[in-house]
Regions:
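Single conserved hydrophobic/aromatic residue that forms the stacking wall/gate
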Residues: 215-226
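Conserved, mostly hydrophobic/aromatic
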Residues: 33, 43, 139, 198, ...
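The substrate-binding groove and active-site-proximal loops of carbohydrate-active enzymes
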Residues: 10-22, 171-185
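Hydrophobic faces of well-ordered beta-strands that scaffold small-molecule active sites
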Residues: 4-8, 41-42, 205-207
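Extended, charge-enriched "interface" segments that sit outside catalytic cores
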Residues: 67, 76-180
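Aromatic-lined substrate-binding rim segments of carbohydrate-active enzymes
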Residues: 46-77
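Catalytic domains of carbohydrate-active enzymes, especially glycoside hydrolases
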Residues: 25-46
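Conserved, well-ordered alpha-helix/loop/beta-strand core segments that scaffold catalytic motifs
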Residues: 180-212
Length: 226
């Protein structure tokens, strides 16, 4: 059976916070596709972007991009106050430098609220995604601690996953590890809600893979000694 759809990267959706998100505008695009008798919404890779901000170069094959988390949905869940929401911005080209500087400030506030009283949904998410989440969160925490240095520039004991070095890093960076886990919970909560809405309206999401994921990602640290 023939079917058609539209390619629309999440970051290209209009939105008030400098980039397209998984919020109202994404749901409205699903409505548009359904009204236009389309079947597919094709997107680009949705992982956390690395150097150059290309969706095809990600820090993880499994994690979601924190830039796509919708602040308004976090506020609706009681994780942000209205006063903590950034001022709306004019729709225009994405300023990734501004996102890099400003988004973590807001996400930390939401994460702190969640982690102060973890929900059963959060705990279930962490358990279900334990195969990649813990390693990813530790990788990102160490990377932040080391000024975003690439894996090749890490100390040998961390790069080769020496148990003592990993244990020390987990203890030293426990708060940041929890932050990165919470952010992934935010992303996947919103992503799953959007996907369910799209599917219920006869729209299938077609993704892509980050083909430029090389040394600066979390997964090689799990099994490969470089």
């Amino acid at each position: 059976m023939r079917a058609s759809g539209i390619l629309m990267p999440v970051f290209s959706l209009p939105g008030p916070y400098g980039i397209g998100t998984l919020g109202d505008e994404a749901f409205a695009f699903v409505d548009f596709l359904a009204a236009a008798k389309q079947t597919y919404w094709q997107i680009l890779p949705i992982g956390p972007t690395g150097y150059g901000d290309s969706p095809y170069q990600s820090f993880s094959a499994f994690a979601g991009n924190p830039y796509f988390i919708d602040f308004r949905l976090l506020a609706a869940d009681g994780l942000l106050t209205e006063a903590e929401l950034p001022a709306p911005q004019p729709v225009g080209p994405v300023d990734y430098g501004a996102l890099y500087r400003q988004r973590p400030v807001v996400l930390h506030k939401a994460a702190d609220r969640l982690l102060a009283s973890p929900t059963p949904a959060y705990e279930a998410f962490c358990e279900a995604q334990s195969g990649w989440l813990e390693d990813y969160a530790l990788f990102m925490a160490v990377k932040a601690e080391r000024g975003q240095a690439g894996l090749a520039d890490w100390p040998d004991d961390l790069r080769t996953r020496e148990p003592a070095a990993l244990a020390a890093a987990k203890e030293r960076l426990a708060a940041e590890v929890d932050y990165y886990k919470a952010v992934q919970f935010f992303f996947y909560t919103q992503w799953n809600a959007l996907k369910a809405y799209a599917n219920s309206h006869g729209i299938q999401l077609v993704g892509d893979i980050p083909i430029l994921s090389l040394i600066h990602i979390s997964e090689p640290t799990r099994r490969v000694v470089i």
